């Protein structure tokens, strides 16, 4: 069956404040507990705090985003995984998976009421999925469409890691899909104007939400890691919501 990659994700406007994904620690975060900060809770005046991260988590002392991770800890948005010795780990380089990312967006939107359908729109997501409600919400609000096959069925692939290009698209749409003229000359040598998420990635770059790698790449198909999510969330608050400066 062929898959329509261009139909991977769509977006919707949302008014949000920062939050983070807290996983329960099963495998590579295949089951997740997503904590929330509801709309109206100000994060103004909170700046990144590397000391908070290193004192809270034993595995981020040398992480380039330890300050942003500390900011999330200060806001009560990231508790990590408790260890038998009483310490905690953040697991900064773990992949963020699609189901968890959708749950993250749902909580950011205030955990709205969801009218569940009689049948799931996805062949691989049913009521046994811990994020069934969140995934249905995302589909109903045109945030995700999943992969559509030739026979008309759809798959969501909930435990597949989120790619960086999809993360860019989600943040762009969370900002309300603002008017933005992407540059003719690409900012990243591996993201060309023909890329389906070129505008969204360039918007992230223009708003300093992403910087890419020192070698001039964005690596759009690489998996999004937890430390990168911390950085993106913090920068989104500064650039789009005007908080955290």
What residue ranges belong to the model's regions?
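Short, hydrophobic-biased amphipathic alpha-helical segments
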Residues: 225, 229-232
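A short amphipathic alpha-helical interaction element
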Residues: 69-72, 105, 138, 171, ...
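Feature responds to low-complexity, polar/acidic, surface-exposed segments characteristic
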Residues: 2-10, 22-64, 79-102, 107-134, ...
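Sec-dependent signal peptide hydrophobic core
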Residues: 9-17
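Phosphate/pyrophosphate-binding loop motifs in nucleotide- or prenyl diphosphate-using proteins
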Residues: 76, 142, 208
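Short amphipathic alpha-helical surface patches that serve as generic macromolecular interface elements
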Residues: 198-201, 226
